[in-house]
């Protein structure tokens, strides 16, 4: 019985030592995980901010190729696109709400397309006649 108790005592010491090592390992792993999550979060934030600015810039470039009658609609779509991307960024916590509506230079993005000159020499897009279209009825 003495041998049995001595064996259990040794096992208990081993478990205590393993638990202590595990506790240290878990604490270290938690610290590294936190660092990793913060790094990914900061990189994602940079990507979201850059992405929103890129969407606005590309939309602005495309508007210069569009006739004057369509500019108003495209401007509204571009503004809603930027607002939507900003809302997603704010909702996910990657961008603070007070950072929304500012581009990388710190100027507001509102009105970015309104001051843009429109080239009157661009050909306007003409809608095709409705004769070539068929009514679509979805299947039940």
Swiss-Prot record:
Residues 112-140 have a biased composition (Acidic residues). Residues 111-140 are annotated as: Interaction with SERF1A. Pfam families: Synuclein. Keywords: Acetylation, Cell projection, Copper, Cytoplasm, Membrane, Metal-binding, Nucleus, Phosphoprotein, Repeat, Secreted, Synapse, Ubl conjugation. The keyword Nucleotidyltransferase does not apply. The modification Phosphoserine is found at residues 87, 129. The modification Phosphotyrosine is found at residue 125. Disulfide bonds: none annotated. Transmembrane segments: none annotated. Its main location: cytoplasm. InterPro entries: Synuclein (IPR001058), Synuclein_alpha (IPR002460). GO terms for molecular function: copper ion binding; cuprous ion binding; identical protein binding. The keyword Ubl conjugation applies. It is found in: Cytoplasm, Cytosol; Membrane; Nucleus; Synapse. It comes from the Eukaryota. One of its GO terms (biological process) is synaptic vesicle endocytosis. Residues 100-140 are annotated as: Disordered. Phosphorylated, predominantly on serine residues. Phosphorylated on Tyr-125 upon osmotic stress. GO terms for cellular component: axon terminus; cytosol; extracellular space; membrane; neuronal cell body; nucleus. Coiled coil: none annotated. PANTHER family: ALPHA-SYNUCLEIN (PTHR13820:SF5), SYNUCLEIN (PTHR13820). Belongs to the synuclein family. Soluble monomer. Homotetramer. A dynamic intracellular population of tetramers and monomers coexists normally and the tetramer plays an essential role in maintaining homeostasis. Interacts with UCHL1. Interacts with phospholipase D and histones. Interacts (via N-terminus) with synphilin-1/SNCAIP; this interaction promotes formation of SNCA inclusions in the cytoplasm. Interacts with CALM1. Interacts with STXBP1; this interaction controls SNCA self-replicating aggregation. Interacts with SNARE components VAMP2 and SNAP25; these interactions allows SNARE complex assembly and integrity. This is Alpha-synuclein. It comes from Pongo abelii. The gene is SNCA.
């Amino acid at each position: 019985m003495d041998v049995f108790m001595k064996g259990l005592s040794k096992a208990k010491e081993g478990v205590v030592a393993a638990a202590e090592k595990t506790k240290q390992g878990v604490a270290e792993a938690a610290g590294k995980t936190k660092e990793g999550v913060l790094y990914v979060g900061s990189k994602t934030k940079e990507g979201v901010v850059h992405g929103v600015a890129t969407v606005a810039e590309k939309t602005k470039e495309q508007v210069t190729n569009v006739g004057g009658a369509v500019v108003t609609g495209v401007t509204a779509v571009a503004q809603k696109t930027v607002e939507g991307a900003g809302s997603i960024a704010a909702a996910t916590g990657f961008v603070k709400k007070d950072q929304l509506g500012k581009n990388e230079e710190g100027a507001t993005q509102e009105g970015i397309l309104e001051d843009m000159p429109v080239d009157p020499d661009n050909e306007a897009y003409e809608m095709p006649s409705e004769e070539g279209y068929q009514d679509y009825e979805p299947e039940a």
